[in-house]
């Protein structure tokens, strides 16, 4: 078995991983319920609020699944059978892909929503929610097929010592793939991620141009002695730009760590760092929404105020 199976002996790694998962679950829960209450309180809910709620729910489920997997990595209470291994690892892979798609499609929807009336994107404003929903369903089916290899590649960890198996948890291991199959799978993953990140880059480029235009307008307003307070569009643009920048930086770091893990033959340290990096966006991104949108802060202040009064 690979060196990564020594993870369960390191208490520091266990504390760091469970802390990340706990913080991420808490943050996504706060964001999800704040958005859900906003959606239920509006006569005509905004599509952007619906997709933010969906993204937070997807990330919440991803982190819960990772928490269950982490339990078997660090403190197994009993050996999982093959069905449990395959189901949880498959669900985790599927949710990671859906979180990536939801992030990208939210970026695109936000760009279309914030586009000016003179923009070429205006004609998509009323149709975009339906198109985004259709695109997400397409990606869902696509990821189900992409992740299906897990159902035949994940096995119960054998008792014998072997370097052929890649460690996943104390109970689960990954069978080695043939070179042709691994190349085909890697190519499909690369095409998927390149497409989604390119789409995010294009929409982010448009957002930069939009933010620059708003800045010019703000300078003009200041020169005419009118209020220079940032508009909701400017705040939304800055939020999505911050999220995109955060996603790209963390994605690049994750890829570097993943390649290092393969190079150093599944070293436990690189395996652990890769897990942390691959879930860092799901943990950090809710705080960007929470800190930049005042209504979420006010919502939870009112909730805690009622609890204290009781």
UniProtKB/Swiss-Prot annotation:
Localization, UniProt: Cell membrane
Example of a GO biological process term: response to pheromone
GO terms assigned for molecular function: pheromone receptor activity
PROSITE patterns membership: G_PROTEIN_RECEP_F1_2
Source domain of life: Eukaryota
Assigned keywords, A-Z: Cell membrane, Disulfide bond, G-protein coupled receptor, Glycoprotein, Membrane, Pheromone response, Receptor, Transducer, Transmembrane, Transmembrane helix
Tissue-by-tissue expression: Expressed in a subset of sensory neurons located in the apical layer of the vomeronasal organ.
Gene: Vmn1r49
Cytoplasmic side: 34-50, 115-135, 212-238, 291-310
Name of this chain's protein: Vomeronasal type-1 receptor 49
InterPro entries: GPCR_Rhodpsn_7TM, Vmron_rcpt_1
Membrane topology annotation: Multi-pass membrane protein
UniProt lineage: Eukaryota, Metazoa, Chordata, Craniata, Vertebrata
Pfam family, one: V1R
Disulfide-bonded cysteines: 85-172
Primary location recorded for the protein, binned into one broad class: membrane
Transmembrane regions listed in the UniProt entry: 13-33, 51-71, 94-114, 136-156, 191-211, 239-259, 270-290
Recorded phenotype for the gene knockout or disruption: Mice show a disrupted pattern of axonal projections to the accessory olfactory bulb. Mice lacking all but one V1ra and V1rb gene (12% of the V1r repertoire) show a lack of chemosensory response to a subset of known pheromonal ligands and changes in maternal aggression as well as male reproductive behavior.
Extracellular face residues: 1-12, 72-93, 157-190, 260-269
Annotated Gene Ontology cellular component terms: plasma membrane
Function: Putative pheromone receptor implicated in the regulation of social and reproductive behavior.
UniProt-annotated glycosylation sites, renumbered to this chain: 81, 159
Recorded family membership: Belongs to the G-protein coupled receptor 1 family.
């Amino acid at each position: 078995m690979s060196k990564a199976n020594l993870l369960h002996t390191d208490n520091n790694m266990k504390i760091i991983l469970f802390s990340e998962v706990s913080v991420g679950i808490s943050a996504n829960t706060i964001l999800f319920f704040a958005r859900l209450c906003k959606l239920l309180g509006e006569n005509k809910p905004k599509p952007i609020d619906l997709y933010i709620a969906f993204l937070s729910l997807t990330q919440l489920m991803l982190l819960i699944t990772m928490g269950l997997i982490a339990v078997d990595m660090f403190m197994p209470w009993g050996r999982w059978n093959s069905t449990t291994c395959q189901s949880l690892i498959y669900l985790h892979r599927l949710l990671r892909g859906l979180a990536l798609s939801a992030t990208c499609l939210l970026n695109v929807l936000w760009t279309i929503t914030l586009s000016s009336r003179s923009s070429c994107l205006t004609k998509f404003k009323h149709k975009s929610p339906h198109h985004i929903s259709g695109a997400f369903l397409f990606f869902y089916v696509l990821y189900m097929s992409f992740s299906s290899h897990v159902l035949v590649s994940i096995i119960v960890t054998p008792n014998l010592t072997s370097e052929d198996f890649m460690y996943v948890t104390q109970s689960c291991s990954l069978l080695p793939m043939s070179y042709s199959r691994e190349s085909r799978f890697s190519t499909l993953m690369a095409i998927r991620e390149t497409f989604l990140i390119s789409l995010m880059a294009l929409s982010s480029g448009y957002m930069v141009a939009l933010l620059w235009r708003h800045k010019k307008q703000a300078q003009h307003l200041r020169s005419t002695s009118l209020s220079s307070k940032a508009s909701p569009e400017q705040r939304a643009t800055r939020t999505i730009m911050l999220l995109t920048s955060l996603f790209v930086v963390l994605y690049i770091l994750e890829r570097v760590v993943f390649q290092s893990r393969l190079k150093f033959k599944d070293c436990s340290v690189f395996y652990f760092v890769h897990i942390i990096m691959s879930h860092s966006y799901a943990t950090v991104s809710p705080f960007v929404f929470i800190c930049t949108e005042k209504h979420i802060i006010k919502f939870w202040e009112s909730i805690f105020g009622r609890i204290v009064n009781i």
